[in-house]
Regions:
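Long, well-ordered core segments of solenoidal/helical folds
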Residues: 29-47, 76-101, 125-151, 175-194, ...
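Intrinsic disorder/low-complexity segments enriched in polar/small residues
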Residues: 3-8, 44, 120, 174
Length: 370
């Protein structure tokens, strides 16, 4: 009898050990699942996402790509975007801008982009609102080229020019005086090959990408002041040292920085892609991106100084998504991740199964005694 009890006890311990090993794998989720969960964890009560004005558009683009507008989660309420209600919210936000005459071009583009992904602006925007937007954009046009951030400003900058051009494009309108705008963009060129926010400012990765993007959209990147030098400007931020763990494959945000960022890598990669995509290091950069996924929350993030963990954000996750898309590598997000942390769900499952096993053993022993 004692041998039987000993065997049953041993079997029970082996079963528990097996459950502890198998349960994490059984509950493992793909990189994509982790990412979508992270986005919904950052959904606000009004239906928006994240904390920055661009976060909602970024989240909806990812959700739309994976058709994840409704996601069922074990032991939790369904996570979803109420499309009709959210479309109404977005239209109201845009309408309010014009009602109070306080138009923010940066927010406007992201509202329009989000709305357009859920329903074409041709049917959702309405002719009156469309015409108000078009008229306001025309009022930001500068005689010397470029666009100002408001219709009362008389100074163009690269950022507002980029946003105005994209608003024209998303509402289906053409940009007038393209030659004048291209001439103004060229005036922002600097000797390092980059482009500043206006003719008097130093180059930055973002404004240089905007300049290249606009030239590609308005004409041809070959018309840049010096295409080769601009290409070298982007490439100069690349970390090609395999011993530089954590940065190998990424791009620095500036020459004084120590850590590569998802945002700077995105702008450099997209700029290089427009000039000469053969100069990209796809495999290395994709691996670098994947190493930036944080499985504590499922999102992507950059290193935070003084903290061993990455700080995930909706914006950083979007840059990671777009980088993988650029290299046709989004399928890697279907990869199962088995390094799932032990959590309460696993504990409940293991304890429940253990309880059933203990109950069976108890009944078996009791019946044997009878």
């Amino acid at each position: 009898m004692k041998n039987k009890h000993r065997k049953l006890s041993l079997g029970f311990l082996l079963t528990i050990t097996l459950l502890c090993s198998i349960t994490p794998a059984a509950l493992a989720k793909t990189r994509q699942n982790h990412l979508i969960d992270f986005l919904y964890d950052n959904q606000n009560t009004d239906g928006t996402f994240g904390i920055a004005y661009q976060d909602t558009a970024y989240a909806i683009e990812i959700i739309n790509y994976f058709n994840a507008y409704s996601v069922e989660v074990l032991f939790e309420e369904t996570k979803s975007v109420d499309i009709p209600t959210f479309k109404e919210f977005l239209i109201n936000q845009i309408q309010t801008m014009f009602n109070v005459e306080n138009i923010d071009l940066y927010e406007l583009l992201y509202y329009l982009d989000t709305l357009n992904r859920m329903e074409s602006l041709e049917t959702s925007l309405g002719s009156t609102l469309h015409n108000n937007i078009y008229r306001y954009l025309n009022e930001t046009n500068q005689i010397g080229g470029g666009f100002a951030p408001t219709n009362t400003s008389t100074t163009a900058n690269m950022v507002s020019t980029f946003f105005v051009y994209n608003i024209y494009a998303i509402i289906g309108e053409s940009v007038v005086n393209q030659t004048g705008h291209k001439t103004w963009i060229l005036s922002c060129n600097n000797t390092d090959g980059g482009y500043g926010g206006n003719p008097s400012l130093s180059s930055t990765i973002v404004t240089t990408y905007f300049a290249v993007y606009l030239f590609d959209a308005l004409g041809d990147v070959n018309d840049l002041v010096n295409k080769t030098k601009t290409l070298e400007y982007f490439k100069s931020f690349y970390i090609d040292d395999p011993d530089n763990i954590g940065n190998f494959g990424g791009y620095l945000p500036d020459f004084l920085a120590y850590n590569t960022l998802l945002s700077s890598t995105y702008y450099c990669v997209k700029g290089i892609e427009l000039i000469d995509e053969s100069e990209l290091n796809g495999g290395t950069t994709v691996n670098w991106v994947l190493n930036h996924q944080n499985f504590l929350d499922g999102g992507f993030g950059d290193w935070v100084e003084g903290n061993e963990q990455r700080g995930s954000s909706v914006s950083a996750s979007f840059y990671a998504f777009k980088l993988l898309e650029t290299f046709d590598s989004l399928e890697v997000l279907n990869e199962d991740i088995f390094a799932v942390e032990f959590n309460y769900l696993m504990l409940i499952i293991i304890l429940s199964i253990s309880g059933v096993i203990i109950g069976i053993i108890y009944l078996f022993i009791r019946r044997r005694r009878i």
